[in-house]
Amino acid sequence: MVRPRRAPHRSGAGGPLGGRGRPPRPLVVRAVRSRSWPGGPRGPQPPRIRARSAPPMEGARVFGALGPIGPSSPGLTLGGLAVNEHRLSNKLLAWSGVLEWQEKRRPFSDSTAKLKRTLPCQAYVNQGENLETDQWPQKLIMQLIPQQLLTTLGPLFRNSQLAQFHFTNRDCDSLKGLCRIMGNGFAGCMLFPHISPCEVRVLMLLYSSKKKIFMGLIPYDQSGFVNAIRQVITTRKQAVGPGGVHSGPVQIVNNKFLAWSGVMEWQEPRPEPNSRSKRWLPSHVYVNQGEILRTDQWPRRLFMQLIPQQLLTTLVPLFRNSRLVQFHFTKDMETLKSLCRIMDNGFAGCVHFSYKASCEVRVLMLLYSSEKKIFIGLIPHDQSNFVNGIRRVIANQQQVLQRSLEQEQQQRGMGG
């Protein structure tokens, strides 16, 4: 059974990664040898990936498949996650194959080009343990990800089986290049192809430059980890411009994590009767660190309709059962000021997702707090009922506007 060791609680303000103004505190992980995967209500149980081992030696501490370690063994860090490791010894070969990845070329070459690398690779486990790899593919494709993007996945990393990876030194340049990259703050993510019949879908590879070893983590909660790592990769792509050029650091605002970037478009009323002007702003959606918002299927452009808040009172029960995200707009300050003024005067934004979009979100609401100067997005959990409710609201609004227009025309006719 994996037993995370909790760091002592310290009072003070701040999020889950530590107090305000302080760097994230390492999450120290310890585990004991287990005869089987965690059972019962403690988490998902992959039925085939099993770790079995003999009882631990007296006085020894064991972390997953990496064997006994001393109390002062150096740690392998993954962002704020500190993991202990052990040299390759008394291990059993569990898998042999090829690892493939792409790395950027040297700065003096074409910066947009990537160099494909491959290395013969073996995975080892402790004697007495069993890692079922008979369905693993013979070639694993690895994507390199900055470790700083993985700090939110600490709870999923803790609940993992470990295996030690070893590379045959046939290609010293490739191995040195991989050690250099991973020693400078990168981790490897191996996504197993869906056509593969094995139950492992993702595996993470870490490197200790001090111990000169590679360690693989196989999360027990494969489904949860796949969703989380997809979110990380999506965020990574959004933070990197065309050709792999960074458009800036990964944005974290008030301990919130960037989940989506695109454009918000809407029409706002003009002073002239029945006249509207089209507006748009670059837009970003943030979630709390550790939360996952599936935005990989969101369109790059969202269309918003402004609705008087007084028409939304009947939807309050559906608003209560919603997920909250934070919106941030950039660049055109005049357009942003205009949007703030309109929404501060009693309007809310209804963002309809195109039916062509394959994401599960069909509608979200945008509200503005003039006191805190922030935009809050509400994503109702009951999308179907909310869509029906908002349609009725919009239909009623159109009827009210139509009656108002007819009355205005009648008054003009009587005055003439």
Curated annotation (Swiss-Prot):
Residue stretches of biased makeup (Low complexity): 27-39
Does the record carry Metal-binding as a key word?
Answer: no
The answer to whether the entry has keyword Iron is no
Q: Where is the composition biased (Gly residues)?
A: 12-21
InterPro entries, per the entry: Med25_PTOV (IPR021394), Med25_PTOV_sf (IPR038196)
Query: Which of the residues bear the PTM Phosphoserine?
Result: S53
The compartments listed are: Cytoplasm; Nucleus; Cell membrane; Cytoplasm, Perinuclear region
| Free-text description of this protein's post-translational modifications in UniProt | Ubiquitinated by the CRL2(KLHDC2) complex, which recognizes the diglycine (Gly-Gly) at the C-terminus, leading to its degradation. Ubiquitinated by the CRL2(APPBP2) complex, which recognizes the Arg-Xaa-Xaa-Gly sequence at the C-terminus, leading to its degradation.
Instruction: Give the span(s) annotated as Disordered.
Output: 1-54
* Keyword annotations of the record: Activator, Cell membrane, Cytoplasm, Membrane, Nucleus, Phosphoprotein, Transcription, Transcription regulation, Ubl conjugation
Instruction: Please give the residue ranges the record annotates as the region Interaction with FLOT1.
Output: 184-416
One Pfam family, short name please? Med25
- GO-annotated cellular components: nucleoplasm; perinuclear region of cytoplasm; plasma membrane
> PANTHER family recorded for this chain?
MEDIATOR OF RNA POLYMERASE II TRANSCRIPTION SUBUNIT 25, PROSTATE TUMOR-OVEREXPRESSED GENE 1 PROTEIN
Tell me, how does this one assemble?
May interact with CREBBP. Interacts with FLOT1.
What job does this protein perform? May activate transcription. Required for nuclear translocation of FLOT1. Promotes cell proliferation.
Family membership noted in the UniProt record: Belongs to the Mediator complex subunit 25 family. PTOV1 subfamily.
Protein name in UniProt: Prostate tumor-overexpressed gene 1 protein homolog
The protein's organism comes out as Mus musculus
The lineage, from the top, is: Eukaryota, Metazoa, Chordata, Craniata, Vertebrata
